Amino acid sequence: MISDYPDTKQEVEATSRQNIHLANVFVNYERVFGKGWKINAGTNVQLSFTDNSSFTYQDKQEDLSATFAQKEKEYTAGLYAGFSKRFGKKLVLSASLSAEYNKAVIDSAGRKWTLWSGVNLYPQLNLSYTIDPSNMLQVNFSSDKKYPAYWAMSSNVSYLNVYSQVRGNPYLEPERIYMARANYILKKKYVFGLFANHHVNYIRQLYYQDTKALRAYYQSVNFDKHNTFGAMAVIPFRIGGAVSSRFVASGLLIQDEGIFIDIPFDRKKLFGQLMLFNTFTLSKKKNLSLEVNARYSAPSIQGIYDVDGIYNVSAGLVWNPIPKKLSVMLRGEDLLKGLRAKTHIDYPSQKSDMTIYSDTRSVSLTLKYTLGKMNRKNKKEIDSSRFGQ
């Protein structure tokens, strides 16, 4: 199908604003009981109030489809408890469980609705079993959550240019992540592992070409399913006394399933990743070494995207004139310009090729001097990952 659109000239002006008020209170309790039982428990409460707005004009006229004002309130309350214990000389076990209540309410265009409300459980389990002094088995199960950015949850339409837009999604839900991993450590240096990741309401931004107008837009959506299964191996080795290397290989099966606008997708892809880290000792007397690292990721998928393979070659010259005190590093990243992502979409009415032309090459010089030991106070950092546009 070929559509003929008349040539037009448009002028777009937009002013956006975001105000966020965030309050968080948490309490943690730890105690060690007899026979090495360590117990911890606690609670946390968080409130957030977000005010997003944008005023957009096309050719000096207000664009009502891209002008909005939206308020959002989120409430979070959680409890957690856990323990850790060493059993004999071989087994170390720790486990915890947290229960968290979340509620989000949106007020936009005179209408209020509850975006999400409910209780979710987040278990954690870590087991380490020493088979003998040289071999060990480690098993880990963990869970976490990821919230969408506040701006992505608004009813906004932001113009990248007169053709491309970024649209918000006021129906985005938090993503829950469950991860399982088992590693076998052989001879204290070789690592062989299996892993599986399951994502509920997986959040990703996809690209859609409008079938009724000369327009395309990006929008973050929740996938129905995103699973990753894989195996990995870490092989360290030395070449003579001057070269120390570590080779990491992994094979993965990725599965994406969901509906984006009017495009259902159910896709699977096998791909691999290779990494090689090398340290060349140039002078032991002068504490001078060269680091050369290479990474390659084979072609994969992301929703309706086909993603080309990417690679990165980096190098760094490290000099320690005063061991454990003064270090100087000259480092270069993406020396061969291999991190330029390329994606392709090939669906009925949706065909596109995209290359990110941003230059990710960089050169940095770092000087580090250690004055002495410093006792850092434990403090909870403010999570700013949801701020901004």
Which functions belong to the PLM regions below?
Residues M1-P6, D51-K60, V105-T114, Y150-S158, ...:
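Outer-membrane beta-barrel translocator domains and adjoining extracellular loop/strand segments
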Residues D224-S297:
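Gram-negative outer-membrane beta-barrel transporters
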Residues L274-N320, L326, R331-K337, H344-I345:
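C-terminal beta-barrel architecture of Gram-negative outer-membrane proteins
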Residues V45-D51, A99-V105, W113, F141-Y147, ...:
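Transmembrane beta-strands of outer-membrane beta-barrel pores
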Residues E72, K145-L194, H198, A216-F229, ...:
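Outer-membrane beta-barrel signature, preferentially recognizing the C-terminal barrel domain
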Residues M1-S108, T130-S134, Q138, Y190-L194, ...:
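Face-selective signature of the C-terminal outer-membrane beta-barrel domain
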Residues P321-Q389:
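C-terminal beta-signal and adjacent terminal beta-strands/loops
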